[in-house]
Design a protein with these regions (language model features):
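Mixed-charge, low-complexity intrinsically disordered regions
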Residues: 1-15, 24-107
Length: 107
């Protein structure tokens, strides 16, 4: 599966949108997300949905990379080669599947 411009990646409640993409790399920028509710009965896990094209500053990426985009190598460890991933400062960003992203606030 090839990453396209506009594709959204997620990691524990944070979302990133591809602003440029080639077969081997993707340039991403962080985007806003909205709180959708609680994902568990105890209130520790929160659900978030992305707001495409609403770019923000991300402290993990830094201000300059957030404004200009950060170019990352696309990796796909799946057998069927249909699950592209990006790695950002040790965090694994997965292609968003359309469901709310879960952020565990218990830590």
């Amino acid at each position: 599966m090839q990453v396209k411009e506009g594709d959204i990646f997620e990691c524990e409640g944070s979302f990133y949108q591809a602003i440029k993409a080639t077969t081997k790399t993707a340039t991403i920028r962080p985007i806003e997300s909205t709180f959708e509710g609680l994902a568990d009965a105890y209130g520790w896990e929160h659900k978030y949905m992305p707001l495409p094209n609403c770019f923000i500053c991300d402290p993990i990426m830094g201000r300059e990379a957030s404004d200009n985009g950060k170019r990352l190598k696309i990796r796909d460890y799946s057998r069927a080669k249909n699950s592209p991933e990006l790695e950002l400062c040790g965090y694994r960003l997965t292609l968003w599947d359309g469901t709310p992203s879960i952020c565990d606030t218990y830590n």
